[in-house]
Amino acid sequence: MFSYRHAFHAGNHADVIKHLTLIATLQHLQQKEGGITIVDTHAGAGLYRLDGDYSETGGEAQDGIFKLLSKLDEAAEGKDAKPIPDALQAYLDMIASFNPNGQAKFYPGSPFILHAMLRKDARDKLRLFELHPTDSKALASNVAQLDAGRSIMIAREDGFESLKKMLPPPPSATGSKRAMVLMDPSYEIKSDYGKVVANIQDCLKRFATGTYLVWYPIIPRPEAHDLPKRLRTLSNQAQKPWINLTLAIGRNTDGSTAGLSASGMFVVNAPFTLKDKLREAMEVVGPALARGTGHSWAVEHN
């Protein structure tokens, strides 16, 4: 069960849409003063080298962040250069903040992105769960280098199970009870799909006003095909707004699709401005990451 290591996939196209959506969602939630409890159920190692052995072995950043940056540079030099959409710019600024020399050598995972967005008056709290023994140790070591204080808690635990004790969230320093949860298991175990649905259902019962984000792979597997449908049903039954962003980068020119070629981000109780911001961003990201044939993107909502 511990064969998956995100270091092999850091900065790929799935990370681009995952973190683009994550940043845009939290930015909206932070427009209100109330503190937020933020939970990352499958945190990974937190920070990754894009020039390290793991990422170079997978090479997936070449079809993700590296390709996006290259295409944006080309567009900026063209005659019809257009402003970069706000949500995409926020994502690019976040990546750049971890690479001050201008070269993309480091890629922040969701724990480091979320830590960078915590408001410094202790209003927001970050709770990180990672069960993989190696990644959990790396996460603790990486976070130890941050000036995190008591704003971050790390536990080597099953995020699916530990999430239950996080909701409803405790009152923040401002007295508010607000929560945002990111759920992105590896799905290498088939039961992960069912656990995601069960956890979202449980979350909505425990804390109906929370915002819940789910990343999922788009692969030829019945469980993967059914997951967004089941999340839509849960959201509609709970009368919550939802967004489903999908990106398929397409096949290589030789028709092959080495590695994952499509994934999605589903947001339950989505902020009302999010769909437009994501659509604007994807109008740039989608074409930039497209390859060969079979590429597409969509931003669906209720």
What residue ranges belong to the model's regions?
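Class I S-adenosyl-L-methionine-dependent methyltransferase catalytic core
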Residues: M1-N302
